[in-house]
């Protein structure tokens, strides 16, 4: 008899949804329902625990991230090709805690390390190896060939560092050649020479091009049609046409279409319906229908909510303007998901702390890691600022005004997750009014301490770093273009953008 058949199906289900349909699901036991049941039990344990797990352990999280700068745990040996991603997760996590400079010389050291991962065009000095005829881009680790996804991680990490040294690290001309070489006839981008292509690799290529101001018509050609073909009957997007809708690929498709000013071409009502059902009673987001929630989807799904809400708000305002000729009302509205419940899932259920370190795991009672710590903080950030994406602007680069994306942050959310001192029990019912007022003030102070830095929903980089990066990148472009010593080939390269 299999382990699945041995399970006692008369055992009480803790989920309200499942309990209401117990007769329907008792005969359909799968690995997912078993895992879901275990996770719900873990959440109940956390809810009944008296341990202090209701706040973001910022100092301990910072210790955990900084510890990864010098040495990576033995368990990470299999991630050698993801060194560039580990760098981004650590740097971005520290930056969201507004503590990037807490580690001595981290900006300079990180910039120099990331420069080693860059492959120059035509056998340049970086990563010089035999038959390296096709340079440009970044590899995932030392001496690795260039990969579009690794390139996105490297460029993002250099943006997070935010110094002139980090911006100058990137060879934009070689990068453009690399991206063009990855372009497919379907309008997508392959991961590497001879590699696969999907909506993920396509987003990474488009995001890199937009961040480096090298997004041209020839790079954009066919991309919108390919991404739109990835939307499924469910409403979300798959890796490529006729795949199952998936939270990560949905983010990649929606974010790339936002960069390309094509959100209006999406079946938005279908997408809205699909993503609305992705938040569970636990507060977390699941990546696919009938799958477990996962901390990383706090960003992947949370960002999609914000992007499409920006779309709805924009057209709502347009309709108001067209109706009465006056500027549309700026109503203060919450986001399309339960912000406080999402923060509760990440902070209370998935934060794993010991005496020295803290971080986030994918599920309750699992080990913390850099990946989920980074995206857990990103999801918390997105849920703490109601207007973070209210005015996502056109991301076309090199217009007459050189406008770049920088969604405004006008107010903090009122839905910052806090737990009262009585920990949801009735022991303090007899507190006098003065005590209650003090508790209220303490909760307000705790709310301020629980805020993390706001990140851009499309790039997952702190907004101030996004704005600074686009401004400095534009300055470097203009400076290089005006330099009399620039090569003829480089002049032809930059002419693509001047004549766009």
Swiss-Prot record:
Residues 119-133, 420-449 have a biased composition (Low complexity). Binds 1 zinc ion per subunit. It holds the Pfam family Prenyltrans. (2E,6E)-farnesyl diphosphate binds at residues 246-249, 288-291, 297-300. Zn(2+) binds at residues 294, 296, 372. It is an enzyme of class 2 (transferase). Its EC number is 2.5.1.58. Catalyzes the transfer of a farnesyl moiety from farnesyl diphosphate to a cysteine at the fourth position from the C-terminus of several proteins. The beta subunit is responsible for peptide-binding. This is Protein farnesyltransferase subunit beta.
